[in-house]
Amino acid sequence: MPLSTSLLGKKSTYKDSYDATLLFKIPRINNRNVLGINNNLPFYGVDIWNTYEISCLNKNGKPLVGIGTFYIPADSENIVESKSFKLYLNSFNNFIVKSIEELEQIILQDLSNVTCAKVTGRIFPINTKIEFGIPSGKNIDNLDIVCNNYGPPDNSLIEYEDVLVEEEIHSNLLKSNCLVTGQPDWGTIVIKYKGKKLKYDSFLRYLISFRNCNEFAEQCAERIFIDIKNAINLDFLSIYIVYTRRGGIDICPYRSTDKSYALPSNKRFIRQ
């Protein structure tokens, strides 16, 4: 189905009964073609979806609530349009289950069906202790730079020094807009790499050039990955973007050149 038929940016009615057909799939290939990515993916990874509006009823009609974390593989055929996922989750509000674990399995199966991949994850009780994380690596945001490009993203700004390093850097200045609604997506990006050293000032300008860019979170992550990879011959590269919550959901893409990558800790940063 074309993206124009999705519910993004449109007035919606919340259904009062469970409906898996609310999930709207978007083929990844649509946006990857723009980036020159074919089926031979240049990365491995996952999209981490944290969902804060999950509720259903137990057998006595009493509400249950939880926080969900779901992992959609980067090699899935489709992604899920975020507003459709929000409407889908809210269709469980009057749905009776034996346990929250039953709800968890239903959601995992539905997500696996629509993405054509094995989706994993779980629903946590809301009294689970949460520890805020701090972005790892060197923060590059305090550089005194002049910026005048806020879109489209300019990969010519990615420059490097003729010195080999293995390091981790991060920035809290990433901002783009939803492809359909134009609503802002605010993110913290963590980059780990091994190879020629990125020039921090020019790279920060590159990140800031996404400011008025209209793309989905997953596409922004993959564009940054591809742009770095094409600019510098690296032995290793991973990027992890933690986006702030919108509509009760935050999406955190992770991409890596390492097939045996370790999942990010998924600790919330302060803006989540």
From Swiss-Prot:
It is found in: Cytoplasm. NADPH binds at residues 82-83, 246-247. Pathway: tRNA modification; tRNA-queuosine biosynthesis. SUPFAM superfamilies: Tetrahydrobiopterin biosynthesis enzymes-like (SSF55620). GO terms for molecular function: preQ1 synthase activity. Pfam families: QueF, QueF_N. The active site is at residues 178, 185. One of its GO terms (cellular component) is cytoplasm. Substrate binds at residues 80-82, 217-218. Keywords: Cytoplasm, NADP, Oxidoreductase, Queuosine biosynthesis. GO terms for biological process: queuosine biosynthetic process; tRNA modification. InterPro entries: GTP-CH-I_C/QueF, NADPH_dep_7-cyano-7-deazaG_red, QueF, QueF_N, QueF_type2. It is an enzyme of class 1 (oxidoreductase). Its EC number is 1.7.1.13. It catalyses: 7-aminomethyl-7-carbaguanine + 2 NADP(+) = 7-cyano-7-deazaguanine + 2 NADPH + 3 H(+). NCBIfam families: QueF. Homodimer. Belongs to the GTP cyclohydrolase I family. QueF type 2 subfamily. Catalyzes the NADPH-dependent reduction of 7-cyano-7-deazaguanine (preQ0) to 7-aminomethyl-7-deazaguanine (preQ1). PANTHER family: NADPH-DEPENDENT 7-CYANO-7-DEAZAGUANINE REDUCTASE. This is NADPH-dependent 7-cyano-7-deazaguanine reductase. It comes from Rickettsia typhi (strain ATCC VR-144 / Wilmington).
